[in-house]
Amino acid sequence: MSIEEPSTQHIAQPQKYVGFDTITTQIENRLLKRGFQFNIMVVGRSGLGKSTLVNTLFSSKLTTSQGRKSPSEPIEKTTEIKVASHSLLENNVRLNINVIDTPGFGDQINNEKCWEPLVKYVKEQHSQYLRKELTAQRDKFLADTRVHCILYFIPPNGQKLKQLDVQALKKLSEIANVVPIIAKSDSLTLDERSEFKKLLQSEFMKYNFNIYPYDSEDLYEEERQLNEDIKSLIPFAIAGSETEIEINGEMVRGRKTKWGAINIEDVSQCEFVFLRDFLTRTHLQDLIETTALTHYETFRSKQLIALKENASNPNRQSQLQKDQGQTSQQSNQDLKNTSGVPNAPMFQSTTGTAAAR
């Protein structure tokens, strides 16, 4: 039996109005009712302004500092995972956001493999999602805790990457969308900032990090150009501020320093606006889709292949069983919520609802 290939279709205009053009409105209405899920992890040493930046990005009080308030406070023994969950409402669009903080990262005397709890957390979220997918009677909409973006905070020291940062960026960029930023860049002069950015960009190329956004043949020309413009800015040199100050008679979000005052929304002084627009106005959906179609799909394929191989050889312990066993054990030890109250089974969080200001 031969199958006739479909011929090139001619695009015709219906003689009368049909109404299928309303499908975009139907999709929009359904999505608006459900809301959108976005999960962002912040990684960096204490004192780099991680909580302040997240609150500034979303113009809401989403998280509080989990680091040491003073040198007299004890250092966290291990890297922890703390999740804060909120719902933001802006112009009838609801964004359900999980902010994943990582107190203790890079703060120990011996920071060897301090990124492992982060890698395990990311993989565990993939593993949970896969288990839900493979359930015989799964929910219509699967709760998504997969990490869509990792903001990696680099100290503004003007030096090459430390081995800790090299290893962490390498491991994390293999499994998630990593966006490096220069924290508290207002501590640098514009010339120092420019030189430091060039140094870090050369370091990224040297170590071949898989930094987001990625190249793709599926992109339109304008999307490809936008990504090139963004890559030229990475790492974003930023400063965050949750307060308003007066500059030239105008109230703006900014910070006062010993050199004067900085308006964080002035692109000549700070790249905060570029980072905000990138994360929320141009690439929010792509971050979510890339997580699902690239990082999760890679994880899923490996796990299903391991399951198949394990089924054909009952005496062999599959990589899936190893990953799940190790990650679940670590989850119970490392993952605490911001209130310190135990919460089962895999990770713990606090929840809240806020309207974006």
Swiss-Prot record:
Instruction: Specify whether GTP-binding is a keyword of the entry.
Output: yes
Give the GO biological process terms: adhesion of symbiont to host; chitin localization; chlamydospore formation; cytoskeleton-dependent cytokinesis; exit from mitosis; fungal-type cell wall organization; growth of unicellular organism as a thread of attached cells; hyphal growth
Out of the domains of life, which is the source? Eukaryota
The annotated region (G3 motif) lies at 101-104
Q: Where is this region: G4 motif?
A: 183-186
Region (Disordered) residue spans: 310-357
CDD domains assigned to the protein according to its UniProt record, in alphabetical order: CDC_Septin
Cross-referenced Gene3D superfamilies: P-loop containing nucleotide triphosphate hydrolases
Domain (Septin-type G) ranges:
34-306
Identify the Pfam families for this entry. Septin
User: What is the annotated localization of this protein?
Assistant: Bud neck
Q: Where does GTP bind?
A: 44-51, 78, 104, 184-192, 240, 255
Region described as G1 motif:
44-51
GO cellular component labels: cell cortex; cell division site; cell septum; cellular bud neck; cellular bud neck septin ring; Gin4 complex; hyphal tip; incipient cellular bud site
Q: Which UniProt keywords apply?
A: Cell cycle, Cell division, GTP-binding, Nucleotide-binding
* GO MF term list: 1-phosphatidylinositol binding; GTP binding; GTPase activity; molecular adaptor activity; phosphatidylinositol-4-phosphate binding; phosphatidylinositol-5-phosphate binding; structural constituent of cytoskeleton
This chain's function reads:
Plays a role in the cell cycle. Involved in the formation of the ring of filaments in the neck region at the mother-bud junction during mitosis.
- Protein family according to the UniProt entry: Belongs to the TRAFAC class TrmE-Era-EngA-EngB-Septin-like GTPase superfamily. Septin GTPase family.
Q: What is this protein called?
A: Cell division control protein 10
What is the species of this protein?
Answer: Candida albicans (strain SC5314 / ATCC MYA-2876)
State the gene name recorded for this protein: CDC10
